[in-house]
């Protein structure tokens, strides 16, 4: 759909479709976002997932977070039936990497910034020997046990904190990841990425585990934990709290976010980062999770950030990353696209076709 030539006060010039699960809609597409987007010439339209995608729209831009294989087939049909019409963000092939905790954090090793991933091992065999696995990976307790698949279900967020070996054995019934738990002062830094913008929010996290807890044989060997990182912490200088330098420097956060964005080939995601402070090693940062298309309503000022991003994508003013992320899912269309601009279902002007 070509943009209409109209003033900002007239009807929207662009149509952005969104295909999200119901629970995701409520955490992203709020009235405040709809109003701001409309005021700036963008109309947000929900995709009816019960109807063929190719029969809807047309859309200038399509954002999505759907998990079933049928959705990818619908994107391919949309490209075939309406070539050169819609830009899709982000590409299914790039998103796939974040739906498997075995590959989710691989990108971190390629970053140029001093950040890493806690040691972890993938358990794919229910008959695996716990001692052998732990020894081979050189893991130390406590551990976090995470389901291998990330599919939006409640089960994919069912995690446990494991204090000793006999807490591991009951968990080996399903594919999972065992990751070392790093004491981090009960503070998690959740970084929201929208295009080239990164916003860091301090949130509560699991408290540190004292050494004596690992030796307490009368205590439970493992315990489930809910996702308690959704509550923002007070500013670091409130009520005698942490020092002013508690939150990572903005330049550091931006550099990490930029590296992840280029390595993943994604525009919309967040990542969880923690910091270990010790006299032996000083400050060490770890990335423990990356999530595609998070609940942006928890990000301060998300309405303006998303609206700006939509317009940049639609107007072709997005900065060009160094490389396209792994696998577009629609390879023949992705070749028409500037690196990092999603799936190229829209033909780009020849002047913008080169990176």
Curated annotation (Swiss-Prot):
1D-myo-inositol 1,3,4-trisphosphate binds at residues 65, 157, 190, 291. The gene is ITPK4. Induction: By drought stress. ATP binds at residues 101, 146, 179-190, 205. Its EC number is 2.7.1.134, 2.7.1.159. Keywords: ATP-binding, Kinase, Magnesium, Metal-binding, Nucleotide-binding, Transferase. Residues 236-247 have a biased composition (Acidic residues). This is Inositol-tetrakisphosphate 1-kinase 4. The keyword Nucleus does not apply. Belongs to the ITPK1 family. It is an enzyme of class 2 (transferase). Residues 107-318 form the ATP-grasp domain. It comes from the Eukaryota. GO terms for molecular function: ATP binding; inositol-1,3,4-trisphosphate 5-kinase activity; inositol-1,3,4-trisphosphate 6-kinase activity; inositol-3,4,5,6-tetrakisphosphate 1-kinase activity; magnesium ion binding. Kinase that can phosphorylate various inositol polyphosphate such as Ins(3,4,5,6)P4 or Ins(1,3,4)P3 and participates in phytic acid biosynthesis in developing seeds. Phytic acid is the primary storage form of phosphorus in cereal grains and other plant seeds. Binds 2 magnesium ions per subunit. It comes from Oryza sativa subsp. japonica. Mg(2+) 2 binds at residues 289, 291. Mg(2+) 1 binds at residues 272, 289.
């Amino acid at each position: 759909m070509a943009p209409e030539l109209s003033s900002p006060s007239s009807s929207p010039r662009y149509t952005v479709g969104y295909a999200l699960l119901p629970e995701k809609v409520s955490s992203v597409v709020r009235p405040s976002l709809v109003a701001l987007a409309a005021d700036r010439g963008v109309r947000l339209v929900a995709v009816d997932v019960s109807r063929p995608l190719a029969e809807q729209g047309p859309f200038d831009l399509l954002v999505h977070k759907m998990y079933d294989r049928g959705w990818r087939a619908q994107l391919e049909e949309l490209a075939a039936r309406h070539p050169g019409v819609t830009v899709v963000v982000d590409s299914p092939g790039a998103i796939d990497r974040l739906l498997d905790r075995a590959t989710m954090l691989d990108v971190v090793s390629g970053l140029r910034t001093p950040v890493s991933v806690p040691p972890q091992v993938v358990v794919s065999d229910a008959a695996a020997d716990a001692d052998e696995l732990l020894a081979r990976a050189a893991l130390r307790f406590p551990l976090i046990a995470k389901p291998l698949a990330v599919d939006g279900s409640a089960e994919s967020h069912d995690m446990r904190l494991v204090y000793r070996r006999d807490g591991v054995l009951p968990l080996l019934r399903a594919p999972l990841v065992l990751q070392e738990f790093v004491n981090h002062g009960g503070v998690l830094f959740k970084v929201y990425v929208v295009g080239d913008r990164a916003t860091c929010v301090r949130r509560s996290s699991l408290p540190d585990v004292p050494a004596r807890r690992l030796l307490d044989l009368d205590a439970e060997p493992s315990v489930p934990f809910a996702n308690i990182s959704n509550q923002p912490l007070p500013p670091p200088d409130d009520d005698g709290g942490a020092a002013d330098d508690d939150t990572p420097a903005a330049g550091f956060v931006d550099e990490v976010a930029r590296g992840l964005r280029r390595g993943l080939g994604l525009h919309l995601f967040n990542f969880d980062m923690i910091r270990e402070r010790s006299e032996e090693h000083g400050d060490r940062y770890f990335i423990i999770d990356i999530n595609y298309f998070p609940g942006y309503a928890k990000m301060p000022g998300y309405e303006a950030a998303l609206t700006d991003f939509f317009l940049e994508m639609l107007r072709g003013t997005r900065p060009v990353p160094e490389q396209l992320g792994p696998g577009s899912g629609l390879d023949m269309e992705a070749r028409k696209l500037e690196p990092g601009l999603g799936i190229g279902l829209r033909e780009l002007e020849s002047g913008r076709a080169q990176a």
